[in-house]
């Protein structure tokens, strides 16, 4: 036998399996991976593909017709309940959109992420892999003109229409990602659906849910249908429902409407032994081809399917939109029972036979009704009960509130209406869309810049104000940004991070310039920052004119939901070297989070930090990280001095360091962890050394300008 016989020709571990990573060797090292996800190396479409343009070619009428036909085209390999896939498709859409949380804007239906781990294998998403496979022929037919994200969101909407609901509308424009997100924190738990009393719980104190999470445990979309930690108690469950839905930007009325509307159709599946289900998709064998939860010992389909473990329908007619949910919930008394799969569920006492839904396969058989603990909360919680009673008495009002809430659920993470595409986009402006009126594009931009330059405002004031206006942008749900100039409105004008006194002084000047020139305040704020950068670059010997596109509008107080905007408050900003208070996460980790939400890369983050420091934009005017004797000049001094071995770095307090001359021990500068990480982290140091090079002084300026412009234009969807 030769030396190579019987041995794998591939070196084990390094490239094809999960090996010990750098992060595991050095768990305290800063992980920059969240800044390099979704790049072109994983995207097979190529740099010239533009989904927003491609989807405009979609034959929406034909697609709608195909989806309508699919709803009643039952397949033997996964039969439709009562011959209609509506309930399954609604659950598919709901569980895609329902991962959204308002705190950081992450999650939601906007990326098609349900195709990938962990979502494709969450316990709460059991058997949704079958729904996506049922949709595959439609995706295959319409190809690049229809993303998975749009199709998944649209399927539930058409399902409702096919069952009799007049929907509020629909917008296309969601672009697919091609691998799981690395930036979404789903929770601290290390197992699926553990009790909240376990170690690594997301709850503290009096059932206080960790931010930014909007689900009660790992693997569930919202709440446990059996009750808190699987223990039925509708009033306790009502608390969980209220918290999780509020964190998804839904009020009590929307919560009741979505709960009732979601359970007006379809059924729960638990007529079998859940222990007989095979592994989830990510753990399934290769021959299962990405399908999970397969029952290989029994049929496991149709009336014998097991999903949540609860068993039964909520209404007598589960394939049609009606008011049966409230009629059943409010008119019957309910008692706790166990499903065939052993799950807690509520069943009616002495139901009338005509109220019992028929079997999914045999219409001559009647099955019992069921309510989850969350459904019972709609009856037992006093506020939810009032809303339920109103909906019961006014079915038309219920249908309208639900249709609007469903539209909000499926579009909350799409951003402003400028991103909406398709023939069914509603004309009505909705407050949660953060509407912005169109701005003036026809004014003398240079005249505005000249007035700004002559205003007497400092470079620091100009740049800081523009940055503060733009930094609220979140690429996760496309909210925030400089467009709208909401920095001049409540609540933003009073945020500590925006230095209200300085902001008021600068805005008073810039608003006057806007009024005199016909430009929007939003445009003038951005132009002010550009003027400051151009002046600083000129002082450094680089003549450059920053790109600028007029047309931002000015939002009004009436167009601004102050409560909704509160979540955009910057409680930390490493770019301005500021923390509102101490946090469990390190300052540099918080910087990465803001950078990722801004849609920036690690090199862009690096060059922006270096530039903003020497421009003197620190919050409160602190000098931490201002490694230059030429403040206000756009030099690469931050990087030159950071990488200079003539200096020694010493701790001088919590998140504070002194930079001392090695020979004299004289303190030269002070710094924070955010400053020093650009010299301590090996990747960031590589970028810092690049910008510290003698031949890259002009490159530094031009790269800073490019990154700055990217932030200023991040929310300009009208330019796409």
From Swiss-Prot:
One GO MF term? metal ion binding
Note the InterPro entries from the entry. Catalase_peroxidase, Haem_peroxidase, Haem_peroxidase_sf, Peroxidases_AS
Question: Post-translational modification, briefly?
Answer: Formation of the three residue Trp-Tyr-Met cross-link is important for the catalase, but not the peroxidase activity of the enzyme.
The source's domain of life comes to Bacteria
**Keywords on record:** Heme, Hydrogen peroxide, Iron, Metal-binding, Oxidoreductase, Peroxidase
Q: Where is this cross-link: Tryptophyl-tyrosyl-methioninium (Trp-Tyr) (with M-248)?
A: 94-222
Annotated residues for binding of heme b: 263
Catalytic activities? H2O2 + AH2 = A + 2 H2O; 2 H2O2 = O2 + 2 H2O
Q: Where is this site: Transition state stabilizer?
A: 91
Tell me where the cross-link Tryptophyl-tyrosyl-methioninium (Tyr-Met) (with W-94) is found: 222-248
What cofactor does its activity depend on? heme b
SUPFAM superfamilies cross-referenced by the UniProt entry: Heme-dependent peroxidases
Q: What is its EC number?
A: 1.11.1.21
- Which residues catalyse the reaction? 95
Question: Per its UniProt entry, what is the enzyme's top EC class, as one word?
Answer: oxidoreductase
Binding partners and assembly: Homodimer.
Tell me what this protein is called: Catalase-peroxidase
Record organism: Synechococcus elongatus (strain ATCC 33912 / PCC 7942 / FACHB-805)
What lineage is this protein's organism placed in? Answer: Bacteria, Bacillati, Cyanobacteriota, Cyanophyceae, Synechococcales
